[in-house]
From Swiss-Prot:
Primary role: Mediates depolymerization of hyaluronic acid (HA) via the cell membrane-associated clathrin-coated pit endocytic pathway. Binds to hyaluronic acid. Hydrolyzes high molecular weight hyaluronic acid to produce an intermediate-sized product, a process that may occur through rapid vesicle endocytosis and recycling without intracytoplasmic accumulation or digestion in lysosomes. Involved in hyaluronan catabolism in the dermis of the skin and arthritic synovium. Positively regulates epithelial-mesenchymal transition (EMT), and hence tumor cell growth, invasion and cancer dissemination.
Annotated compartments: Nucleus; Cytoplasm; Endoplasmic reticulum; Cell membrane
Name listed for the protein in its UniProt record: Cell migration-inducing and hyaluronan-binding protein
Name of encoding gene: CEMIP
Domain GG-type lectin stretches: 176-317, 1227-1361
Coiled-coil portions: none
């Protein structure tokens, strides 16, 4: 007996036992009713007929059994009344305006132990504009379950949703049947013999009738041996006519061919027939068009199997011309020729790179924006082309050409056993899905609109985990793990045998302001609402469609202020909704409002308006969303967070007059799972496509709406996160997941004109019992998968937010962990991710569509693929931001930068004004298929990065604890031009636009009061020629400004301003350990007097304690001396600098920004003379206070050999050429060092070291004396000419070398800029090859030239975008 048979037997046995119990024990009636409610003998058959004016009241103990379809005005079940639906073969449709169940009333269709097996539909009808007075609580078109009411809907047990287990390709080509394709190397006549009963290939063979006449004889013998009735598929690949004899030609003619008799050289020819039935033949033939022209002969024929199913045989014999785009060519001149650019001119400029007759031309701006092109023809050939930018001739642009390759042969045989149908291979047993059921397959690309619906067909040959569906997929739907990430498409069941649906009009009508401006369809559907005190609510196996209204409170399923609905509320069994499909809804899917403990399990929400799974006011807790699927979630009009940009701008009735909408800030937040309280459980859920976000945890500082007062302010921001594991998010625009932001909990006013519940700022910091004075309790996110989200895989702001064993792939930005722009909101907390995988560009390339604007090259193979945002968008794995962050034991895979697209595994937030913590730690990182040049990118001015001149852009830094990123354990990686953290031994990484340094680092947080438009200049005393300019993080409309540079400890600094110095200033010591110090000189106008004190500020308790004062000293040395409560400042009025030593006095926790006692601050009040000028003391400060640059913390040794985990690695290159002064003598000093091995120079002139760019080995080193450089420079030219391509060439001068003359042109050949002028000292890293790497560097100065940098090995040219 099969599984289904056993289930039927057990079900019948249970019913038999129930009836025996009823017969022997009459008191057991209630037990039977609970098992199969329609079998109770108390029920009275009821058939009210069809009367739209009939107001039905079922009460006073009436128990009715609805046995047939009916139409009534309304139904009210109360006072112990009960309506039960008869379970039999005849479908029952109950059509009514509304159903109200309260005061002991009950409605039953099936039960948990006896699921309803027939078909039952409730249709809620009516328009909003009929003049009918809506119920003040329930409205119109509803099923209302009030106090004492019970609603029990229990449909058939069916699998709710599962995963695709085999990839579906567009058109279904790879889903069953047979596919055969050959090109070169498979010449001749190809024959397939096909069984007409099943469509399977019985045998196939190849006959090389080009090579030998014996092959013709063998072909005839083969065809004669095939029994009549078999299907023959015959075609030529490449060439088959040269030794094709008459016997073979006649044999094919006998089978029904008309063209084989005259087959010529390389003619494409295809033929299908049934042996013994020449009239069944189909045939195609075409002559060969030469090596530059495509030609194809194609046939197909439909056959029917013995089971009545159809299969299609397709056959093609072709000469195919493949095409490819050339590289991009930069063009920076406006055409001076009338009629456009001559293509011949480009041929000359780029010989061998452009074909003679391009098929197509593309042009873009230098930033990648598409431009219009026009091809002008002359005598049938491409003669000129013109480029236009908004109607004008382009000035500076890039152009490329589509060129055809020589043709190649191609033979294809396809047998499609699923004609206009597709077999789905699924993870689970889906035998509960029946013919006629509707399924939806989720998108596995960036666009959620690639979700597709299919109808199940009968399939006798399907396995238990297979179904046949009508039609073919339009899009690629992944059904496998790709690059370590489970990207399988979700497949949801939409059909159920119990249906609750709204009756809809054909088009939109204006029952609410603006509604028809946004929707062209009727959105006034039905809804189900549960009120406080309902008796029971259990819904399963039910389909809800056309439900919800664009009115607040009218949702498909709505638990409204119901309180505790589980055991805590006295419900046994606890309330649940499970195994539901809620689709094509007009306002959400499931709303939990002021209700706790609800189980929402195995629910599919599809094609909804507004947040799908929605918690409303903030106090909703302990609800569990288990194995729920939401997809195709679109914007709605109800709340600002539901609205898209158009709605946000048009719907302003709930705002204060004068409000100017900012859609991306105030609105644009529609989400599949909208969690207004973190203390809810999300397990095994999938957010498979929303206009904005998959999972969004949002915070209500105080409860809103009717829930006002249910918790104290700030409770939701501190409550620990419920269970969150095994969830997945993809095909969303903004993010797969967000923990951040709040909603505005006050009405619109003159002070804040934004509408109630607009999106605002909020911070999450989970603590035990939601008490910030109790220990922190981290929010744990485990086994989360985020892929194909256009912007972010996840944006998570904390507090302690920790991720473990997560997977991110194909997101614009995989993950951003944020804390606070100035401080972590919860000081001492951290954000962490460990044991996780990030994939930049996976094997899921998506589907190219005609209107897909974001398609372009990518991945390791540079093939076409869908892209997240723009062709040149800098894809990033983890975006470092704020801090402190810990990244541990993570793997990065397939991040490959292109020339024009700065893809990287690790990077920083773009256009960042905020702080960057030097204690952002990275350890245990592994890279797979990530070139070492693409591991990190600090940014550069250009598209997406803009000018890279915001404060956070300039101060980016992180700690490479074990060297797994940089190969330098314990190093700090920083932007290459941040001289506040650099020292003389830092090593540049040009590919990253960064530097590898060592040291002890912290931050200063400087607040300048009563001003917001000052630009601050800070200088480290040992590098006075390299200031750092900070604009301030805040807008110019604030009453103060703040600056937060990362600084090297135990160093001296000066601070200057572009206007008069601020009269009030506070300096906070951030990330200082006890005893850490810096010395600061602040520029003020002469005549200024000061009042300076120190204090400790406890941000949590908002308490400040004064700890001391600074008194003036006339001796600079005394600044170094301090005593408890008393320190010194030195006012050097000549230079205009106020000197202070800032030293931390208290211990600090590991991840805290401030000490355990609070934040240590120094406050300065300055009485500044009126009309004082600009406070920039640089000219008087230096060289007076210049300090010698020293390395306090030695650079770590680079990892080598077996310590490295990847084949590519960095080669360390150090070069110095300088004059060193010893007493009264000057000594010339020069050397080249490669990976720790020095090559000193002994003679004046040029030293040269050549390195193999593939292996990183030094292959030669020599020197050229001045006499050679000056007299016989061709020796150097000849030497360079013999250097193999792909070689790194290092050069350093020594002594008074010849810095001018013909020999310097060698530098240009090795990548130096043309027209260079050398000074007295020179160091150069060059490259001999066909391209110029970014790391080619020339340093030339009068006294010292120095290059410390790394070069990637092997040297590989980046592919162009």
């Amino acid at each position: 007996m099969g599984a289904a048979g056993r289930q039927d037997f057990l079900f019948k046995a249970m019913l038999t036992i129930s009836w025996l119990t009823l017969t022997c024990f009459p008191g057991a009636t209630s037990t039977v009713a609970a098992g199969c409610p329609d079998q109770s003998p108390e029920l009275q058959p009821w058939n009210p007929g069809h009367d739209q004016d009939h107001h039905v009241h079922i009460g006073q103990g009436k128990t009715l059994l609805l046995t047939s379809s009916a139409t009534v005005y309304s139904i009210h079940i109360s006072e112990g009344g009960k309506l039960v639906i008869k379970d039999h073969d005849e479908p029952i449709v109950l059509r009514t305006r509304h159903i109200l169940i309260d005061n002991g009333g009950e409605l039953h269709a099936g039960s948990a132990l006896c699921p309803f097996q027939g078909n039952f539909t409730i249709i809620l009808y009516g328009r909003a504009d009929e003049g009918i007075q809506p119920d003040p609580y329930y409205g119109l078109k509803y099923i209302g379950v009030g106090k004492g009411g019970a609603l029990e809907l229990h449909g058939q047990k069916k699998l709710s949703w599962t995963f695709l287990n085999k990839t579906l390709h567009p058109g279904g080509m790879a889903e069953g049947g047979y596919f055969f394709e050959r090109s070169w190397g498979h010449r001749g006549v190809i024959v397939h013999v096909i069984d007409p009963k099943s469509g399977t290939v019985i045998h196939s063979d190849r006959f090389d009738t080009y090579r030998s006449k014996k092959e013709s004889e063998r072909l005839v013998q083969y065809l004669n041996a095939v029994p009549d009735g078999r299907i023959l598929s015959v075609a030529v690949n490449d060439e088959g006519s040269r030794n094709l004899d008459d016997m073979a030609r006649k044999a094919m003619t006998k089978l029904g061919s008309k063209h084989f008799l005259h087959l010529g050289f390389r003619h494409p020819w295809s033929f299908l027939t049934v042996k013994g039935n020449p009239s069944s033949s189909v045939e195609d033939h075409i002559e060969y068009h030469g090596h530059r022209g495509s030609a194809a002969a194609r046939v197909f024929k439909l056959f029917q199997t013995e089971h009545g199913e159809y299969f299609n045989v397709s056959l093609s014999s072709e000469w195919v011309q493949d095409v490819e785009w050339t590289e991009w060519f930069d063009h920076d001149k406006v055409s001076q020729t009338k009629g456009g650019e001559k293509i011949s001119d480009l041929w000359k400029a780029h010989p061998g790179k452009i074909c003679n007759r391009p098929i197509d031309i593309q042009a873009t701006t230098m930033d990648g924006v598409n431009l219009s092109t026009e091809v002008v023809y002359k005598k049938g050939q491409d003669y000129r082309f013109a480029c236009y930018d908004r109607g004008r001739a382009c000035r500076s642009y890039r152009v490329r050409f589509l060129c055809g390759k020589p043709v190649r042969p191609k033979l294809t045989v396809t047998i499609d056993t699923n004609v206009n149908s597709t077999i789905l291979n699924l993870e689970d047993n889906v035998q509960s899905w029946k013919p006629g059921d509707t399924l939806v397959i989720a998108s596995t690309d960036y666009s959620m609109y690639q979700a597709e619906e299919f109808q199940v067909l009968p399939c006798r040959s399907c396995a238990p985990n297979q179904v046949k569906v009508a039609g073919k997929p339009m899009y690629l739907h992944i059904g496998e793990e790709i690059d370590g990430v489970d990207m399988r498409a979700e497949v949801g069941l939409l059909s159920r045998n119990i249906i609750v649906m709204g009756e809809m009009e054909d088009k939109c009508y204006p029952y609410r302001n603006h509604i028809c401006n946004f929707f062209d369809f009727d959105t006034f559907g039905g809804h189900i609402k549960f009120a406080l005190g309902f008796k029971a609510a259990h819904l399963e196996g039910t389909e809800l469609k056309h439900m919800g209204q664009q009115l607040v409170g009218q949702y498909p399923i709505h638990f409204h202020l119901a309180g505790d609905v589980d055991e805590r509320g006295g419900y046994d069994p606890p309330t649940y909704i499970r195994d539901l499909s809620i689709h094509h809804t007009f306002s959400r899917c499931v709303t939990v409002h002021g209700s706790n403990g609800l189980l929402i399990k195995d629910v599919v929400g599809y094609n909804s308006l507004g947040h799908c799974f929605f918690t409303e006011d903030g106090p909703e807790e302990r609800n569990t969303f288990d194995h729920c699927l939401g997809l195709l979630v679109k914007s709605g009009t109800l709340l600002p967070s539901d609205r898209d940009s158009k709605m946000c701008k048009m719907i302003t009735e709930d705002s204060y007059p004068g409000y100017i909408p900012k859609p991306r800030q105030d609105c644009n937040a529609v989400s599949t799972f909208w969690m207004a309280n973190p203390n809810n459980n999300l397990i095994n859920c999938a957010a498979a496509g929303s206009e904005e976000t998959g999972f969004w945890f949002i915070f209500h500082h105080v409860p809103t709406g009717p829930s006002v007062g249910m918790y104290s302010p700030g409770y939701s921001e501190h409550i620990p996160l419920g269970k969150f594991y095994n969830n997945r998010a993809h095909s969303n625009y903004r993010a797969g997941m967000i923990i951040d932001n709040g909603v505005k909990t006050t009405e619109a006013s003159a002070k804040d004109k934004r509408p109630f519940l607009s999106i605002i700022s909020a911070r999450y910091s989970p603590h035990q019992d939601a008490d910030p004075l109790k220990p922190r309790e981290p929010a744990i996110i485990r086994h989360f998968i985020a892929y194909k989200n256009q912007d972010h895989g996840a944006w998570l702001r904390g507090g302690d937010v920790w991720l473990d064993s997560c997977r991110f792939a194909d997101n614009g930005i995989g993950l951003t962990l944020a804390s606070g722009g100035t401080f972590p909101y919860d000081d001492g907390s951290k954000q962490e991710i460990k044991n996780s995988l990030f994939v930049g560009e996976s094997g899921n390339v998506g589907t190219e569509m005609m209107d897909n604007r974001i398609w372009g090259p990518g991945g390791l193979d540079h093939s076409g693929r869908t892209l997240p945002i723009g062709q040149n968008f800098p894809i990033r794995g983890i975006q470092l931001y704020d801090g402190p962050i810990n990244i541990q034991n993570c793997t990065f895979r397939k991040f490959v930068a292109l020339e024009g697209r700065h893809t990287s595994a690790l990077a920083f937030r773009l256009n960042n004004a905020w702080q960057s913590c030097p204690h952002n730690n990275v350890t245990g990182i592994a890279f797979e298929d990530v070139p070492i040049t693409s591991r990190v990118f600090f940014g550069e001015p250009g598209p997406w990065f803009n000018q890279l001149d915001m404060d956070g852009d300039k101060t980016s830094v992180f700690h490479d604890v074990d060297g797994s990123v940089s190969e330098y354990p314990g190093s700090y990686l920083t932007k290459n031009d941040n001289w506040l953290v650099r020292h003389p031994d830092c090593i540049n990484v040009p590919d990253w636009r960064g530097a590898i340094c060592s040291g002890c680092y912290a931050q200063m947080y400087i607040q300048a009061y009563k001003t917001s438009n000052l630009r601050m200049k800070i200088i480290k005393n040992d590098f006075p020629s390299h200031p750092l300019y900070l604009e301030g993080a805040l807008t110019r409309s604030t009453h103060y400004q703040q600056y937060q540079p990362v600084v090297t400890l135990q160093k001296g600094y000066t601070i200057h301003w572009d206007q008069t110095a601020p009269a009030e200033l506070a300096i906070w010591l951030i990330n200082f350990n006890k005893g850490d110090w810096i010395r600061v000189g602040l520029c003020y106008p002469r005549g200024t007097t000061f009042s300076i004190l120190s204090d400790v500020h406890n941000r949590l308790l908002k308490q400040t304690s004064k700890t001391g004062v600074f008194v003036r000293t006339l001796q600079m040395d005394k600044v170094e001396q301090s005593y408890p409560g008393r320190s010194h400042y030195y006012w050097d009025e000549d230079s205009g600098l106020l000197f202070l030593k800032l030293k931390a006095q208290n211990e600090r926790e590991k991840f805290a920004f401030c000490s355990m006692k609070g934040c240590e601050r120094i406050k300065i009040k300055a009485l500044i003379p009126k009309n004082a000028g600009v406070s920039d003391c640089t000219a008087t400060a230096y060289p007076k206070f210049t300090e010698r640059a020293v390395v306090d913390v030695p650079m770590p040794k680079k990892l080598f050999g077996s310590q490295l985990k990847t084949k590519d690695h960095f080669l360390e290159v150090k070069m110095e050429s300088s004059k060193q002064h010893f007493f009264h003598l000057w000594n010339d000093f020069a050397y080249i060092e490669v990976d720790g091995k020095k090559y000193p120079s002994s003679e004046d002139g040029i030293q040269v070291v050549v390195i193999d760019g593939n292996q990183g080995r030094v292959v030669s080193h020599t020197s050229f004396r001045n006499s050679i450089l000056q007299g016989i420079p061709w020796q150097l030219f000849n030497y360079v000419a013999t250097i193999p391509d792909n070689s790194i060439v290092l050069m350093a001068s020594k002594g008074r070398y010849v810095s001018r003359g013909p020999w310097t042109r060698v530098l240009e050949k090795l990548g130096a800029d043309r027209g260079l002028k050398l000074k007295e000292q020179m160091a150069f890293v060059g490259f001999k090859g066909s391209f110029r790497p970014i790391w080619v560097t020339l340093d030339t100065e009068d006294h010292k030239a120095k290059i410390f940098q790394v070069v990637p090995i092997p040297v590989v040219k980046k592919k162009k975008l």
